[in-house]
UniProtKB/Swiss-Prot annotation:
Disordered: annotated segments: 218-320
Name used for this protein in its record: Muscarinic acetylcholine receptor M2
Positions glycosylated per UniProt: N2, N3, N6
Native source species: Sus scrofa
PTM comment, free text: Phosphorylated in response to agonist treatment.
Transmembrane segments: 23-45, 60-80, 98-119, 140-162, 185-209, 388-410, 419-442
A Pfam family annotated for this UniProt entry: 7tm_1
Modified residues (Phosphothreonine): T446, T450, T465
């Protein structure tokens, strides 16, 4: 943001410009917005924490954005409401500078997080074979930390120490604004750097994302689907682990992965799904043989370039003799970050030995790989991510644009912006923090369901909500 108050407010009388009923109305509306902002962003953070299906790299960026929005809801909204209804700043220059530093650092961090989300999605769509291998949780954490540190360095020192740099504090008593914004050129420059430039970058990135997605959809419709070559049982290299207390996993992630190669070796670049590939896998405690096809990119599987991976694991039930096999078919030519996979669950009888089980595993794999790939539409999860990003960007532009337009006008004509209009424009920037959680819920069914479970105190199986 830029300019905490309209520079034309100099000499403002230390009395409230509003009548009593207006003050009550402003406090009720502002207080409600603050409360909704706090609750909404806490829901986002808790949802990502408790639901493993939301623990993805993309959602970690949303978690960081929710942290920034939460701080705005707790501090910025309420202090600005106080400043507005009283008509002057009653907390002194030190608290004023601390509030401004916090407000601008957090607001800039929000913009930086939006840029990160846009770049992340852009690289996922345009570099599906090279970017995913770099797209790790550690990398995401470093990018998020860099966004916050850079925002702090850009704003906090200048806001807190500018008066000492120039040798005098020019902000009048009873007012609270950034001192170096008295310079019109600086105000204009910061508005460009803090809003207009990021908006241009994000708009261009989203245009490329949309164009790449549409291009892939057209390609999918035109290209015929090649049937998969059957996998010979002799190529199946698996090891059945006897179910005992030592190797029974205590969590859903404990699976052994043994690969069956058909054609070329898999490329490391497609080991992670840019959309929701970080979701954890779980074995099913079923009592019958079942095959669940979840091929999200079957139409891109080629005849001579595919990799079939099997995952062998056991049920958590100590008395179970089940064997769970997961077949993941990954394509080398796919321009999507989403690998195809087929999950097969095999239940062995208690009398079967290891060789018999292995033969059954081989036959089941051969049977599944003989099936021709079916034409599927583009992954719905990919659409969810893209739709969520679009909603967030639109909300950001719509809520921040009025204020930043007024900033430029105020640079050349300070009396042209009425104080009430200025206050509304400034508040719209804050309302963006209220809208963001609603964008997640409306565009992502998993977020919506998790929100509902949390609000209704339905905690059973909340970690597996999809």
């Amino acid at each position: 943001m830029n300019n905490s108050t309209n520079s034309s407010n100099s000499g403002l009388a230390l009395t409230s410009p509003y009548k009593t009923f207006e003050v009550v109305f402003i406090v009720l509306v502002a207080g409600s917005l603050s409360l909704v902002t706090i609750i909404g962003n806490i829901l986002v953070m808790v949802s990502i924490k408790v639901n493993r299906h939301l623990q993805t790299v993309n959602n970690y960026f949303l978690f960081s954005l929710a942290c920034a929005d939460l701080i705005i809801g707790v501090f910025s909204m309420n202090l600005y409401t106080l400043y507005t209804v009283i008509g002057y700043w009653p907390l002194g220059p030190v608290v004023c500078d601390l509030w401004l530093a916090l407000d601008y650092v957090v607001s800039n961090a929000s913009v930086m997080n939006l840029l990160i989300i846009s770049f992340d999605r852009y690289f996922c769509v345009t570099k599906p074979l090279t970017y995913p291998v770099k797209r790790t949780t550690k990398m995401a954490g470093m990018m998020i930390a860099a966004a916050w540190v850079l925002s702090f360095i850009l704003w906090a020192p200048a806001i807190l120490f500018w008066q000492f740099i120039v040798g005098v504090r020019t902000v009048e008593d009873g007012e609270c604004y950034i001192q170096f914004f008295s310079n019109a050129a600086v105000t204009f420059g910061t508005a460009i750097a803090a809003f207009y430039l990021p908006v241009i970058i994000m708009t261009v990135l989203y245009w490329h994302i949309s164009r790449a997605s549409k291009s892939r959809i057209k390609k999918d419709k035109k290209e015929p689907v090649a049937n998969q070559e059957p996998v010979s049982p002799s190529l199946v290299q698996g090891r059945i682990v006897k179910p005992n207390n030592n190797n029974m996993p205590g969590s859903d992630e404990a699976l052994e992965h043994n690969k069956i190669q058909n054609g070329k070796a898999p490329r490391d670049a497609v080991t992670e799904n840019c959309v929701q590939g970080e979701e954890k896998e779980s074995s099913n405690d079923s009592t019958s043989v079942s095959a669940v096809a979840s091929n999200m990119r079957d139409d891109e599987i080629t005849q001579d370039e595919n990799t079939v991976s099997t995952s062998l694991g056991h049920s958590k039930d100590e008395n179970s003799k089940q064997t769970c096999i997961k077949i993941v078919t990954k394509t080398q030519k796919s321009d999507s970050c989403t690998p195809a996979n087929t999950t097969v669950e095999l239940v062995g009888s208690s009398g079967q030995n290891g060789d018999e089980k292995q033969n059954i595993v081989a036959r089941k794999i051969v049977k599944m790989t003989k099936q021709p790939a079916k034409k599927k539409p583009p992954p719905s999860r990919e659409k969810k991510v893209t739709r969520t990003i679009l909603a967030i960007l639109l909300a950001f532009i719509i809520t921040w644009a009025p204020y930043n337009v007024m900033v430029l006008i105020n640079t050349f004509c300070a009396p042209c912006i009425p104080n009430t209009v200025w206050t509304i424009g400034y508040w719209l920037c804050y309302i963006n923090s209220t809208i963001n959680p609603a964008c997640y819920a409306l565009c992502n069914a998993t977020f919506k369901k998790t929100f509902k479970h949390l609000l209704m105190c339905h905690y059973k199986n909340i970690g597996a909500t999809r």
